Amino acid sequence: MTTTTFPDSAPAPADDARVIALIGFAHGVSHFFHLLLPPLFPWLMAEFGLSFVEIGATMTVFFVVSAVGQAMAGFGVDRFGALRILLAGISCFVLAGLGLAMATSSSALYAVAALAGLGNTVFHPADFTVLNRHVSPPRLGHAFSVHGLSGNLGWAAAPLFLTGLATLVGWRVAAASTIFVAIPAMLLLWHNRALLDTGHHAHAAKQSGHGTFDFMRVGAVWLCFAFFFLITAAFGAIQNFATPILQNLYQLPLGLAATALSTYLLAGAGGILVGGFVAQKQANDRIIAVVLGIAALLALLLAANVVPGWAVLPLMAGIGFFSGIAGPSRDLLVRRAATARFGQAAYGRIYGFVYSGLDAGLAAAPLVFGGYMDRGEYAAVLI
């Protein structure tokens, strides 16, 4: 068993709170722009005559660009500092929103998806570099908890914002209005630049005696990447297909099946909050194994189709809650993998590479599990 513990006291709680809030808000903005396109799919399909496959491919473009770029963005964070890279990423979101508002062809939608994906590349390496450098170790568990929760809130806000405006004033105005989400984040980060700047660490990396790519020889880094890929592919399967799965397995009406998915996501947010307190005590790989094991058992029970329909919502809540608990401990264990041999000089590179597994998993999920859905093997997706 491996455990990470922290000292009981730390200075500057007010500064810690400011850093956590600023990075949390920026992360929420990044998740908001994950969903720049999907809430507008009905309008975009009608405008440009696209099929579900064609419009869905925009998200494949988004996550492929994000996965590849995230691994490279970590090098930029280590070289130029996290603040500059964060501002560059949010600038891409501004351009993506304006580009979508002015789109005149389906090819423009793919360009917008690529630009938004490029903006998304910076957040995990930059966010976690700032948090690890500027938040006191005793509060890192809570910092990672807020970071994860803010992402969920960004996901929740985007459909309400975009569909609401598109219904009232049209999809182009809705797309253009997203700049009023991104620009305040840029201004806040710039205003607090002295608090957030991580400096340049390329020279420190050279002085440490480690080569630029030496981290890729560490087995723990590859294990973290594989773990992120697998767990996010599973999340993507539920996020994309839970509603039709539950409709077919349990004959639930559409509204109730969609409510079950919302229940899963909200319970996941609650789990992240609880997970922050768990991780603050000790970031333990056994805890991660136990809570994910419980979530897997609940998913198997749901897939077995042996429970009554009323039990679907509690089971979905349980899957989301226990999966969420693992998040902050997972992030702290990645921190340990980053610092064990390379200290602070390689935060950006290691976080960028490991967390590119998230986007790779989200990109792969529709392709891998979509085949099961097409064949009517709904339970297999949950298994």
Q: Which residue stretches match the model-derived regions?
A:
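Juxtamembrane intracellular "pre-TM" segments in multi-pass secondary transporters
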Residues: 3-14, 196-224
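Helix-loop-helix hairpin linking two adjacent transmembrane segments in secondary transporters
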Residues: 147-194
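C-terminal transmembrane helical hairpin of 12-TM major facilitator-type secondary transporters
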Residues: 285-330
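Cytoplasmic membrane-interface "Motif A"-like loop-to-helix N-cap segments
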Residues: 79-90, 280-292
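Extracytoplasmic gate region of multi-pass secondary transporters
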Residues: 37-38, 220-265, 269
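Cytoplasmic helix-loop-helix junction between adjacent transmembrane helices
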Residues: 112-151
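Conserved MFS/SLC helix-loop-helix module at the cytosolic interface between two early adjacent transmembrane helices
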Residues: 68-104
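Helix-to-loop junctions at the C-terminal end of transmembrane segments
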Residues: 69-81, 272-283, 373
